[in-house]
Regions:
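Alpha-helical support elements that line or immediately flank enzyme active sites
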Residues: 44-51, 56, 259-282
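Short loop/turn motifs at secondary-structure junctions and domain boundaries
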Residues: 6-7, 77-78, 184-189, 236-237
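Active-site rim segments in enzyme catalytic domains, especially the processed small/beta chain
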Residues: 68-70, 197-256, 263-267, 280
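Extended C-terminal subregions enriched in glycine
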Residues: 129, 140, 145, 149-152, ...
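Noncatalytic scaffold domains of N-terminal-nucleophile
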Residues: 1-45, 49-51, 55-98, 102, ...
Length: 365
């Protein structure tokens, strides 16, 4: 977030050492004021956050933190339940978040392109990197049909299948040949994901954002609570949110759950792990650690991680792709239970991404 983060005195109290150096990842953060707020909520209940003493502290302190939040707005807040968007995978069903979140839907489209008719598994090894780039390009183009609030279905499998008519195994497809052509979108990468599940298979995949790194960079005095930035002024980070779960409704089993972060590259990262774990039967740790590539439609560039294999690079270059290496492509947290939960919880594997400082922990109860 840079040095500008420490223009706020409350932020300096939390995230700087006594000598003025910033706390780094992996070091302990002490938030006594936030702990006090959480204790109040445990004693008085969640309602105190919206209409009680915590609400008054937030509303009163927001202006001091250069924010705008009234107690009337807190009282009027209501969570909104929305049905998930789903699609079939064999006998199972994927569920992901509906618009305005677009990351899970785009990852689902990338995955469907590869799974349909065993397209990825049947492709020669030397063609697979090219195939991944091409289906990613088409998935990002297809979302132009619905991402701006148009009435088109967000995950139309027939429409996706039709987009493969222009695919050539030996040559990159120009984005101008896709309908609609993809657009370049600046997406805020400030988000994170987490997954939690119990031995009964009850599972939540969650993706959240403060619309900017550390939100506004301002802490409400006396609370330890960071104010979120406005999506209208700093870019809609909700676009890239990418939670997904895979279940079998007939047998009431959970098989896979994941979430990714990383802005525009989040869907490609998630789809990469889904493909490796669910199509290639790769152990989850290997699936999450494996090198990734990303094509966001526009600009017409394939982004790869530094450890891409030479033969994959040559395959892309030979087919006319412009290739650029970047330090990392997204971060994924995932749980994979090949035997299903609650039926075979001992088959579950859980993994956080080596590209970040996440945590994966659990066991059989």
């Amino acid at each position: 977030a840079g040095i500008s983060l420490f223009t706020d005195s409350e932020m300096r109290k939390i995230f700087l050492h006594p000598d003025g150096s910033p706390i780094s990842e992996g070091q302990r953060v002490h938030q006594l004021e936030l702990g006090s707020v959480l204790s109040q909520l445990r004693i008085k209940g969640a309602g105190d956050f919206y209409s009680g003493s915590v609400a008054k502290s937030l509303a009163g302190g927001a202006s001091q933190a250069e924010g705008a939040l009234t107690i009337e707005e807190l009282r009027a807040f209501r969570p909104q339940w929305r049905e998930s968007t789903s699609f079939s995978f064999g006998h199972h069903t994927f569920h992901t978040a509906p618009p305005p979140a677009a990351g899970g839907l785009t990852a689902a489209a990338i995955f469907h392109h590869q799974a349909e008719g065993d397209r990825y598994l049947d492709a020669p090894v030397g063609e697979r990197a090219h195939l991944v780039a091409e289906v990613s390009k088409r998935a990002f183009a297809d979302r132009q049909n619905w991402i701006d609030g148009n009435n088109a279905a967000a995950l139309d499998l027939n429409r996706l299948q039709g987009s493969m008519a222009t695919y050539r195994s030996d040559q990159s497809t120009s984005p101008d040949m896709l309908s609609p052509p993809p657009k370049r979108r600046l997406e805020n990468p400030a988000s994170t994901s987490f997954i939690t599940m119990d031995r009964l298979g009850l599972t939540v995949s969650c993706a959240v954002t403060m619309n900017n790194l550390f939100g506004t960079g301002r802490v409400v005095p006396g609370t330890g609570i960071l104010l979120a930035a406005s999506p209208a002024t700093l870019g809609n980070a909700a676009t890239s949110l990418s939670p997904i779960v895979l279940v079998n409704h007939n047998t009431s089993q959970l098989f896979f759950a994941a979430g990714s972060a990383g802005g525009a590259a989040a869907p490609a990262a998630l789809a990469s792990v889904m493909r490796a774990a669910l199509l290639e039967d790769m152990p989850l740790r290997e699936a999450v650690q494996a090198s990734r590539l990303h094509h966001g439609g526009m600009p017409d560039i394939v982004l790869t991680e530094p450890d891409i294999e030479a033969q994959e690079y040559e395959s892309l270059d030979r087919r006319g792709h412009l290739v650029a290496k970047v330090p990392e492509i997204g971060r994924v947290n995932a749980v994979h239970c090949p035997g299903g939960v609650p039926r075979n919880p001992e088959t579950c594997l859980f993994e956080s991404d080596r590209r970040g400082y996440g945590l994966a922990s659990g066991g059989i109860l």
